[in-house]
Amino acid sequence: MTSAIEEEREILESIYPEEFKCINDSTFEITQPIDREESNCDNPPSLIFTCQLSEAYPDEVPDVKITFSEPHPWLGEEEIERLKQVVAQNAEECLGMAMIFSLCSVAKEETNAILIEQSQRETQAIEERHRKEAEQENKKFHGTPVTVESFTEWKKGFDAWRNEQLKLEQESKLKEALSAASSSNARKAILEKRMTGRELFENNLVKLDDVEGEA
């Protein structure tokens, strides 16, 4: 262990008395709990920062590994890669000086930022879902807005229904007239000319007694 690494170890042990763990002479592990309020996350996992220092440290960037104490849906491979890039950039800026504390701090801050972003996305998704549900409920009370196209389609259906009703009414009246007709000639005239009740009486094809009998 070089003097620079030994000095780094002493610094880390004083800053992280419970979180620091020395894997070997050149490999350190620091477990940092993530605060619920700072991250806006109900059950955030702890950030595990592992670094391996070469004999050239601090003039050479350490090999860093970032993991978490347990899986979390907001902290996948994409987010871990983002953390590694931020740490690597900070390490380049700190070359020539003790940097592990700085790298750990940057990793924790970026983890909080990621969790806050994910929390905001989830909140927006929930609000959007509630908004759409509210719109669907409002449609039940306000109905569908009428357009030229929708009215034309409705009118077409209504006209077809109305024509069918008129046809049924005419057929019903025809059956009644046939039943009231006094002779086969009268029934024939009804079928050929579709005569009305008034015309049947005027032409003496239906007797008043027949109609009253039907009633």
Swiss-Prot record:
Residues of the RWD domain: 7-114
Lineage: Eukaryota, Fungi, Dikarya, Ascomycota, Taphrinomycotina
Localization of this protein: Cytoplasm; Nucleus
Annotated GO biological process: cytoplasmic translation
Protein name as it appears in the record: RWD domain-containing protein C1393.09c
GO cellular component, one term: nucleus
SUPFAM superfamilies xref list: UBC-like (SSF54495)
Source domain of life: Eukaryota
Record PROSITE patterns: RWD
Pfam family, one: RWD
Keywords, alphabetical: Cytoplasm, Nucleus
Organism: Schizosaccharomyces pombe (strain 972 / ATCC 24843)
